[in-house]
Amino acid sequence: MRTHNLGFPRIGAGRELKKAVEGYWKGRVSRHALEGEAARLRACHWAMQRDAGIDVVPVGDFALYDHMLDLTLMLGAIPPRFSPSGAAASPAGTGQDIDLMFRMARGEAGLSPVAPLEMTKWFDTNYHYLVPELDADTAFAPDASPLVAQLREAQDAGFTPKAVLPGPLTWLWLARSVDGSDRFALLPALCDAYATLLRELTSACPPACPRGYSSGGLMVQLDEPVLALDLPQTVRDLFPAVYTRLRAAVPDATLMVASYFAPCADNLPVALNLPVDVLHLDLVRGRDDLDAALQVLGAGEGTPGLALSLGVVDGRNVWCADIDAAVNLVRRAADSLGEDRVWVAPSCSLLHCPVDLGSERELDPEVARWLAFARQKCAEVRLVAEVVRGVYGPSTAASLEANREVRRQRAVSPRIHDPAVASRLAAVTSDMEHRTSPYAERIVAQRAALHLPTLPTTTIGSFPQTPDIRAARRALRDGSLTQDAYEAAMRDALAMMVREQEALGLDVLVHGEPERNDMVEYFGGLLQGFCITSDGWVQSYGTRCVKPPLLYGDVSRPEPMTVAWSAYARSLTARPMKAMLTGPVTIACWSFVRDDISRETVLRQLALALRDEVADLESAGLAVVQVDEPALREGLPLRRAAQEAYLDAAVRAFRLATSGVADATQLHTHMCYCDFHDIIDRIAGMDADVISLEASRSRMELLDVFATHGYPNEVGPGVYDIHSPRVPSVDEMEALLLRAAAVLPVDRLWVNPDCGLKTREWPETRAALANMVEAARRVRARLDA
């Protein structure tokens, strides 16, 4: 029995990677220094895993921006616009072209601007990947040299590595056809490209993982989380031929297919018969897969000698594992198959967890005992394996007993349960989940109150967090700035943001959120039942890192959280001022949520706390209140069987939070990049007066679903991408607005950026918003002509 890990956080315990990459972008860090810091982090992370008890460490999970983008580059699937010549670029033989990589990720400004690749959520997580673009003429130019170099780094340093790549069917499933062609028509060529990559890996790296199954060569982990989806039979049927082709290309390699995030369920028979050596199953989110797999393999069916990797430590949450429960699962497999056919692992890549609990110095000691970050999860994997083996010393016995005691203490802690919250939940009635009047009546009252033009302009909420704002926040934390002085600095920043918006000519203003470090962490610091880490960072996309709060107990609102800031902003302008809150679903999705009660109960607790805040904002004179739910779609379970219950709980929680206001108060919500086709009826059921959406990278394609389904309320499709520093032209945004106006009634359209502007700089923000306002003016004039 061996231990391994599917992936490790790449950002560094102190966000060293973020700082190095952003320094490179700004010209303060050389390429040599950037590559040196990346190599140092890789070595540090491999050592952390090995020292915690991981036998085989992942290589290829590290990326300067995104692992899907790295694979796209290794495949040579470069869209023509990223090549100076206009022809498809090929990095073959040159190693990783990091400037090309960053251009694909961020786009390029200048005289010949280039739009970046589209970005969207990685399955149901808060990680974002860059979507490969394909067309009928896409040709592959495979080059594994970047990954070969990393494997050699690991081997030279004495680690036992396994190469990690997204699998071919997952990569193709997640790609986007830009010309309407069938992307699966490229599968034969893609298989050839993968075969070339695998041959390059195995020929360049000596055997590193002998283990007596069917081969003893380099171990390669091919991630196929699409096996956790409700796949069409046509796609499911592709797996055997694809993996037969890959096995033939590298007969001596140790191939592992890894599925995670949900049960394999009806895809399990296909997975168990693939010509590979190891199959990884997520037993945290798909526990029933183990019984089904053991039944098949125990009957002598499936791939002969197939080993199972059992993901028994939760790779997506931070609570200590139930070691006894994990041991029972692994022991059942070992008893059925033999220990030599069982691997122990986290459920998925630890990319979604903070790096090291040891970095926390100020965390509440009681809550800290309940936690395990990535480094500690590797130790939990080792502990499970040692207990199952049954031969261990006093240290392992002590660790096992400590785990049991922590779980006992957490279950009875008075920090967890608040009787007042339970009583209030019990008093909720169904009428609290519905607005007083239907939208058709509300919009009349709102238009009379707000006096807005056709195509009103606004922003999503946040404005650039300048060095002065960040410095003030740091000074408050370290005690060198008093609370009064900090609040004065934030009021000054807020007033400046209001003046900027008035000068730009925006119709509905926001206060800009200078006081907020993060849209979820901020509220986690003010709600009872949460605690905040100092270094619990996880990667959201590229260099964007977030610090999810820890939701450990019953949730309530001790006092108003945002009212003073929004009310002050309202006092500075005669224009409508929009208040911003983060919705219950997003707070839950972007926090590390307790695992001892149902998610529905957590959502309703959050909704009641936010309901109080919405009511106080309305009482303070805020006529527009936005409750953001960018995570609603990403939280959707991957399997259809679980989706209805989730959506019902999510929509009811949103309505519970927002339905206590008068007809004239306009409720907005905001959502990020996602596929709305399968949930559009539920989005309509949220009954927000206005929904703003990320739409620019998809060229307004997502509006088609709103038109097809007759979405009844108002929509603000984003007209420019805030994830790139590029400033789009007036013509570009005008074209997008005209496209939107051709799909939806113009009297129900708003004009806004894709998302908040927190991560941008002021010069590009001013320029882009000025162009946006001018684009709206032009379209109004054209429509009035």
Curated annotation (Swiss-Prot):
Catalytic activity: 5-methyltetrahydropteroyltri-L-glutamate + L-homocysteine = tetrahydropteroyltri-L-glutamate + L-methionine
Alphabetically ordered keywords of this record: Amino-acid biosynthesis, Metal-binding, Methionine biosynthesis, Methyltransferase, Repeat, Transferase, Zinc
Spans through the membrane: none
E.C. designation(s): 2.1.1.14
The protein's enzyme class: transferase
GO biological process: methionine biosynthetic process; methylation
Binding site for 5-methyltetrahydropteroyltri-L-glutamate: 15-18, 121, 544-545, 590, 634
Pathway involvement of the protein, from the record: Amino-acid biosynthesis; L-methionine biosynthesis via de novo pathway; L-methionine from L-homocysteine (MetE route): step 1/1
Disulfide bonds: none
Coiled-coil regions listed: none
Pfam families with a match to the protein in the record: Meth_synt_1 (PF08267), Meth_synt_2 (PF01717)
Family, similarity comment: Belongs to the vitamin-B12 independent methionine synthase family.
Protein name (database record): 5-methyltetrahydropteroyltriglutamate--homocysteine methyltransferase
